[in-house]
């Protein structure tokens, strides 16, 4: 018969497995272990059903699992290896390496379910994190230890922007990064790994000198793995924060898939769906993850989360729930990507809590607001231009439109990671140069330069050089 820590499988419904224990029941969120097709299969307790039965979510495929199979209670939540041993490695949701580089050495492990830091432990200082990307640093700056959302539909450049941020910040940053690939394409995960090796972020010959740990639960994984892999990545990031006391960067691509996986298992667990078919616990699940991503007195976690927007609808419950937790939002717009302007960041929709004169300074704030003012005026004139044409505008409005079109193009920038598409080297622009360049454009100092000179360049010196090249070609 089954003992206290031993149970047996009584029912298998896809990713959900019922297990009966005749002795003491394992606690909610405890990890259970069984063997399926000669492979270790981890289950996580989700519900107590009565009659000594628990309902669990499987962290891997359940094909081949049969009723009566023995199950062992591990006595605590899923625990994963943490610390320097994970640097340069790719782990799955239960902390097993999937990069064929042997087992993860090191003996420190940590449970993936942890309480959020208390108010007393949290740090409240605000400081800008410079990314080197003009449109972000100027109009929606990121704060150290903040949570940043990258919103966008399919194919507008979320993953490319995340890769550029890893590239820019990991190179100039002494801290560690953790990348959690949640329910995204395996090909992209593979590309990212090789790109990190090429750029030196992962040192394949000496893994301990690497700056990043990767945790993957891709599209082909069962929903249990996709619903928990973000927590596994966050657990690694928390350990780096607590042990090294530095600013840790935590990238999630894509937080929507975390919600999607939760909704897939929710119906199997017998919960009545909420709005648009999502799980009724949507806000609770999101809060449990997001509240752990924070700065403490020991160090900080700055997180950048790609958020897929289903059908480009920002009012969908999944992206709308994540809005509440963010310090800055970077909204990627299909209309801007159709103009060929990359990064396709919407300068009027993107926001930041720290775009405040007391944090970023008067000059930065005033230049950012002036840029947004000109772009907003251009947006409101577009209907008139479409119906009546440019000739019907006043001289002042014509000047505003000309400046707005230059600013729009000046907000584009070549990326290092997109060199394969563009053929041009990426540029990182220091914050002071970004502010000075846009201040000069807003004040009309470069009204005489052609629009084309502002497209896909770094600071204003690059614009002047490009204008001279264009003039020489035209001559």
Curated annotation (Swiss-Prot):
<keyword id="KW-1278">Translocase</keyword>
<dbReference type="GO" id="GO:0005524">
    <property type="term" value="F:ATP binding"/>
</dbReference>
<dbReference type="InterPro" id="IPR003593">
    <property type="entry name" value="AAA+_ATPase"/>
</dbReference>
<dbReference type="InterPro" id="IPR024034">
    <property type="entry name" value="ATPase_F1/V1_b/a_C"/>
</dbReference>
<dbReference type="GO" id="GO:0005886">
    <property type="term" value="C:plasma membrane"/>
</dbReference>
<keyword id="KW-0547">Nucleotide-binding</keyword>
<keyword id="KW-0375">Hydrogen ion transport</keyword>
<keyword id="KW-0066">ATP synthesis</keyword>
<feature type="binding site">
    <location>
        <begin position="152"/>
        <end position="159"/>
    </location>
    <ligand>
        <name>ATP</name>
    </ligand>
</feature>
<dbReference type="InterPro" id="IPR000194">
    <property type="entry name" value="ATPase_F1/V1/A1_a/bsu_nucl-bd"/>
</dbReference>
<comment type="similarity">
    <text>Belongs to the ATPase alpha/beta chains family.</text>
</comment>
<keyword id="KW-0813">Transport</keyword>
<protein>
    <recommendedName>
        <fullName>ATP synthase subunit beta</fullName>
        <ecNumber>7.1.2.2</ecNumber>
    </recommendedName>
</protein>
<keyword id="KW-0472">Membrane</keyword>
<dbReference type="GO" id="GO:0016887">
    <property type="term" value="F:ATP hydrolysis activity"/>
</dbReference>
<keyword id="KW-0067">ATP-binding</keyword>
<dbReference type="Pfam" id="PF22919">
    <property type="entry name" value="ATP-synt_VA_C"/>
</dbReference>
<dbReference type="Pfam" id="PF00006">
    <property type="entry name" value="ATP-synt_ab"/>
</dbReference>
<dbReference type="InterPro" id="IPR027417">
    <property type="entry name" value="P-loop_NTPase"/>
</dbReference>
<keyword id="KW-0139">CF(1)</keyword>
<dbReference type="InterPro" id="IPR005722">
    <property type="entry name" value="ATP_synth_F1_bsu"/>
</dbReference>
<dbReference type="InterPro" id="IPR036121">
    <property type="entry name" value="ATPase_F1/V1/A1_a/bsu_N_sf"/>
</dbReference>
<keyword id="KW-0406">Ion transport</keyword>
<dbReference type="Pfam" id="PF02874">
    <property type="entry name" value="ATP-synt_ab_N"/>
</dbReference>
<dbReference type="InterPro" id="IPR020003">
    <property type="entry name" value="ATPase_a/bsu_AS"/>
</dbReference>
<dbReference type="InterPro" id="IPR050053">
    <property type="entry name" value="ATPase_alpha/beta_chains"/>
</dbReference>
<dbReference type="InterPro" id="IPR004100">
    <property type="entry name" value="ATPase_F1/V1/A1_a/bsu_N"/>
</dbReference>
<dbReference type="InterPro" id="IPR055190">
    <property type="entry name" value="ATP-synt_VA_C"/>
</dbReference>
<dbReference type="GO" id="GO:0045259">
    <property type="term" value="C:proton-transporting ATP synthase complex"/>
</dbReference>
<keyword id="KW-1003">Cell membrane</keyword>
<dbReference type="GO" id="GO:0046933">
    <property type="term" value="F:proton-transporting ATP synthase activity, rotational mechanism"/>
</dbReference>
<comment type="function">
    <text>Produces ATP from ADP in the presence of a proton gradient across the membrane. The catalytic sites are hosted primarily by the beta subunits.</text>
</comment>
<comment type="subunit">
    <text>F-type ATPases have 2 components, CF(1) - the catalytic core - and CF(0) - the membrane proton channel. CF(1) has five subunits: alpha(3), beta(3), gamma(1), delta(1), epsilon(1). CF(0) has four main subunits: a(1), b(1), b'(1) and c(9-12).</text>
</comment>
<keyword id="KW-0997">Cell inner membrane</keyword>
